[in-house]
Amino acid sequence: MSATQDLAQHIAAIKADALPDWVFHEAKRTLVNILAVSISAQNAAPVQALTAWASDEGAKPRATVVGSGLRTSPTIAALVNGYMAHLQDYDDTHFPTVLHPTAPVWPAVLALAEDIGASGRDALAAFAIGAEVACRISMSVHPWHYDAGWHITGTAGVFGAVAAACWLLKLTPEQIANALAVGGTQAAGVREVFGSDTKAMHPAKAASNGLQAAKLAQAGFTGPDDVIGGRRGFWAVLSAAGHDEAALNGEFGKHWELANNGLKPYANGVVSHPLQDGVIKLRNEHSLTADQVAGIKVHCHPLVLELMNRPEPRRALEGKFSFQHCAAAALVDGAGHDAQFTDAKVTDPTISALRAKVTAEIESSYGEDEVRVVITLNDGSTVETKVDHATGSPENPMSDQALETKYTALVGAEFTEAHTNELLTAIWALDWAADVTQVTKLMTAKGA
């Protein structure tokens, strides 16, 4: 049996009742988080452009777009919602691989579940299974695939969307293998587009293409036996430097990678989160202001420089991928939320001047969420701190209360207080709902 066929067998065999309670709870946490960041992004210019395009397509109204409430086809809804979910880079992260599993999977699940009338519990289970597949695909090619320049959220994410949709549709193992082929050949996304509007198209297309692949396989589309492990398959072509086959199918259904997933406290690239923790801690402990600081030195994992070395960002999205801006904004504002990543903040004279004083030194022995921050003051004295695990990491997770605070801040800025609270209540109760419409109706500006 090929790697793809084995995976298809695992997906088909899992029953919702076999999922641990904590997995269902974590699935709800990811939905709280992803709807919060999506609703917060609804008025962004690229979202408006994408929504206008979706409206012009004139598709049969079967699924709901977050925010605007546009009703369109499931694949188009998945595309727009997948884009919104990742635009602000405020979605969750699978720490072993830096995959963002929710943005490509939940939009596909919500659109399909709404269309076919799936129960809330089945939607949660489908998400968990899809996220698991995306994480396992990622682990099977990490770090070689990412190092080659691929954006793992787009490439691995499509497999997760396929798996989730296939499970909801109750496809056979043969159909699932075919769907993985249809979706897998569309695995795409290059890291060159980081810091631009285009980056969020990766999970958007993954969600839409994955859902489409499942529907086509249901209709009889076929593919090769092993799109993942074949001679010219995913591993061979998109991860030529290496792969780990055991990471894909080992202990499937017994071990859940949602345990290694983290929710973001800051609205920027996750590898900068530990340095923001450190800078904010020192700022608050020593009442630091920008005019006192001669330099900020960050001792960090190599990935920080590889992904976030933009000393002079020009616009908001570039600021999200500038460790210099993240550190400077953290010291000036004591935060790293949406307000710290606007065009105005990126061009703010105080923050710009402080960015020029931020440097990094690679510590190859450090983990990806580990840093030491040293701040030198104008009088020559220094203050420093060590962060072993960033806030939001699996070792230092965001609590439900902290998640609700993040949710309320983001959604409350767009919806009324009553509407905000009603949606939150609906998400937490989704596992008892007959369908997902209690959520999809409330995730729009008009509400129920």
What are these regions (language model features)?
Residues 96-103, 151, 155:
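Glycine/serine-rich anion-binding loops at beta->alpha junctions
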Residues 103-111, 156, 160-164, 274-277, ...:
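Short amphipathic alpha-helical face segments that pack within enzyme cores
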Residues 113-212, 224-231:
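Glycine-rich, mobile lid/loop segments that gate access to catalytic sites or pores
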Residues 1-98, 191, 195-208, 212-448:
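Terminal-appendage/accessory-domain detector
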Residues 99-103, 118-121, 125-128, 339-344:
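Contiguous domain-boundary segments centered on the initiation and propagation of an alpha-helix
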Residues 79-94, 101-119, 133:
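Function-dense linear segments that define catalytic or interfacial modules
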Residues 3, 7, 104, 126-129, ...:
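Amphipathic, well-ordered alpha-helical segments in soluble domains
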